[in-house]
Amino acid sequence: MSVPLLKIGVVLSTMAMITNWMSQTLPSLVGLNTTRLSAASGGTLDRSTGVLPTNPEESWQVYSSAQDSEGRCICTVVAPQQTMCSRDARTKQLRQLLEKVQNMSQSIEVLDRRTQRDLQYVEKMENQMKGLESKFRQVEESHKQHLARQFKAIKAKMDELRPLIPVLEEYKADAKLVLQFKEEVQNLTSVLNELQEEIGAYDYDELQSRVSNLEERLRACMQKLACGKLTGISDPVTVKTSGSRFGSWMTDPLAPEGDNRVWYMDGYHNNRFVREYKSMVDFMNTDNFTSHRLPHPWSGTGQVVYNGSIYFNKFQSHIIIRFDLKTETILKTRSLDYAGYNNMYHYAWGGHSDIDLMVDENGLWAVYATNQNAGNIVISKLDPVSLQILQTWNTSYPKRSAGEAFIICGTLYVTNGYSGGTKVHYAYQTNASTYEYIDIPFQNKYSHISMLDYNPKDRALYAWNNGHQTLYNVTLFHVIRSDEL
């Protein structure tokens, strides 16, 4: 930055010197500083008065003067000589001087342009330096902020890890305890081996019997853990959107391992075709299915598939049919005496839903209503092979007021509606023949539920909601008493 500034200073001082020299020297070279004017002291002119230069060859001469009759002044002037040789040298000097001045002016212009260019360069460099300085400041501030953020993150991580210190201490203690248990088990194993050698075969069989008894008690405990009181229902998962507003879909809770077939029945009356999908994935993503034709049309949406057979209510009757899906033959038919049918005691949504068949951990059930029970819900436990009624419970809940119903672990749960806001608000326990009013939220996503059944294998509710096939997970509360083990 210092070199362009020195150039500017030199140019300015040079221009000042040239200006001073031209103001002092140039007039003397062209003869502008020797001109003198003289006048007579009196107010009148005479013949001997005039303005004369010192050298008669340099200027005009007043030769004589007089006054005419009218009072006008008449002067006789002698013109200078035509030869101007004495001026030629000065003219030549002036021309040379002018050329020098012009050359100097051109040099000054060139130098000025260079100076302006250097000045622009200096200004540009100055702006770049300012920008670079600003960037350095930003980088410095950003670095400080980044360090501060890293410090905060490390501090937060340390705050998170600090509570783990006592946990690690507990783990150390647990590790020591595990080692102690391992040593004790090894000692116990050696002791048992010694006892086995001493006891003999008969006592070993007795020990084996005790182990088998423990296994049976463990299985019973696991079975009891599978059942419980309903405490919550998850939000629905939409599996597929197909069919009309009414229908049913299901899987077989007693299907063997690897059998994941899905059964699909569209409509609620006067239809007899059942779709079979190979798996839930096929049901969700394709329309590849096998069609089964039932010998009679069904009524309502209360069908179930259980242990390879489909159970349904024959259209416009109170007859239940068990149909084998493999052989496509009727295995058993039975009439539910006094059960209402043909829209006599349907659910609140209608649709010939008089008889609703269900399954749970305990087997096959039928839910319906009779005149003898004043149109209130009746629960019957059925034999899945013979369809005989094993036991019946009469409730005080009106069938027409129920939106839908399902059974979990022998307890019938009833919803208060089928459209809009819905909840499970009534439960009847068949094992104690008691009921209670509950309040379990139930999200009715598509505002028209026409089928709701529990699958004990999946621990889930299957629903048909306004042409959408949905699933709900359930939460069960388990209470196991020590005397039941």
Curated annotation (Swiss-Prot):
Disulfide bonds join 227-409. InterPro entries: Noelin_dom, Olfac-like_dom, Olfactomedin-like_domain, Quino_amine_DH_bsu. It comes from the Eukaryota. Residues 87-225 form a coiled coil. The protein contains a globular N-terminal tetramerization domain, a long stalk formed by the coiled coil region and a C-terminal olfactomedin-like domain. Interactions between dimers are mediated by the coiled coil region. The dimers interact mostly via the N-terminal tetramerization domain, giving rise to a V-shaped overall architecture of the tetramer. Homotetramer; disulfide-linked. Dimer of dimers, giving rise to a V-shaped homotretramer. Isoform 1 and isoform 3 interact with RTN4R. Identified in a complex with RTN4R and LINGO1. Peripherally associated with AMPAR complex. AMPAR complex consists of an inner core made of 4 pore-forming GluA/GRIA proteins (GRIA1, GRIA2, GRIA3 and GRIA4) and 4 major auxiliary subunits arranged in a twofold symmetry. One of the two pairs of distinct binding sites is occupied either by CNIH2, CNIH3 or CACNG2, CACNG3. The other harbors CACNG2, CACNG3, CACNG4, CACNG8 or GSG1L. Contributes to the regulation of axonal growth in the embryonic and adult central nervous system by inhibiting interactions between RTN4R and LINGO1. Inhibits RTN4R-mediated axon growth cone collapse. May play an important role in regulating the production of neural crest cells by the neural tube. May be required for normal responses to olfactory stimuli. This is Noelin. It comes from Rattus norvegicus.
